[in-house]
């Protein structure tokens, strides 16, 4: 088993290639959704995760199906990193009956309980208490499972942020809070809306570790997540990780992004692209043909997901009032 190393961090070649594949799946999926939305094919709103791939993948690389995550309105990347089916995800965004939520959730409410994906959430800050509830279940059942709460920088000013972190600390819950600080709460720069220079600084108020990492460097995210997740899994309690990142697209599709400068977009989209940076690292550590094979497979899987969705039926009218209430036969998390 070949180990790839960098500054004290080691991971297997197999894991590194899995991470590369997941990053490409997220980017390919989001770029395709961007294209389809512009064509007027997709119903509803979409908020794209492209550019932030290193965060979701670097964290979820340490999770298994028994672990759970909560997500945001920008949740496609978290779903893919957690192992959700690409066909089912694309069909859900198309509003088709073969979607993960039978076409009823759409982009902002994709969930897959079998994969521990408790749901994307249209409510800003809606995932904090859900993650705590899942973590409480894991602690009560002594499963050693952990819960991860992904949230954006805009959510760190919501009351549920403080309620969730406080409760997690008081009850010593196995939960990791992951802040995706992409610099803007919709169009408002982070520094205009926060009295703290860093979201991670707020961890001190709740007596938990807090760290800020480069969210464009997947190995930095991977290393920080490994420590926090193992701490939670072994009874050490909650942690807060702030990942400094950048979204390639607007807050939503149709956002003109007039609040961003041309120079910053060039810097992040061309000079600091997370996928290209990880690929440059892998080219020094593994066979380039392996990367090419992954790129080809991912491209084919995205096109397959689109074809599957286009060929799938819409939900029947008789389905309108079904699934109004939760009925999860496996007994929940």
Swiss-Prot record:
- Please give the Gene Ontology molecular function terms for this protein: pyruvate dehydrogenase (acetyl-transferring) activity
Pathway assignment: Ketone degradation; acetoin degradation
**Documented EC number(s):** 1.1.1.-
Q: What induces it?
A: Strongly induced by acetoin. Transcriptionally up-regulated by AcoR and sigma-L factor. Subject to catabolite repression by glucose, in a CcpA-independent manner.
Which cofactor is essential here? thiamine diphosphate
**Claim: RNA-binding is one of the keywords in the record:** no
Instruction: Tell me the InterPro entries matching this sequence.
Output: DH_E1, PDH_E1_Alpha_Subunit, THDP-binding
Biological process terms from the Gene Ontology for this record are: acetoin catabolic process; pyruvate decarboxylation to acetyl-CoA
- What are the entry keywords? Acetoin catabolism, Oxidoreductase, Thiamine pyrophosphate
Do you know which SUPFAM superfamilies this protein is assigned to?
Thiamin diphosphate-binding fold (THDP-binding)
Pfam families, A to Z: E1_dh
The knockout outcome noted for this protein's gene is: Cells lacking this gene are unable to utilize acetoin as carbon source.
What role does this protein play? Catalyzes the 2,6-dichlorophenolindophenol-dependent cleavage of acetoin into acetate and acetaldehyde. The alpha subunit is probably the catalytic subunit of the enzyme.
Q: How does it assemble?
A: Tetramer of 2 alpha and 2 beta subunits.
Q: What is this protein called?
A: Acetoin:2,6-dichlorophenolindophenol oxidoreductase subunit alpha
What is the species of this protein? Bacillus subtilis (strain 168)
Taxonomic lineage is: Bacteria, Bacillati, Bacillota, Bacilli, Bacillales
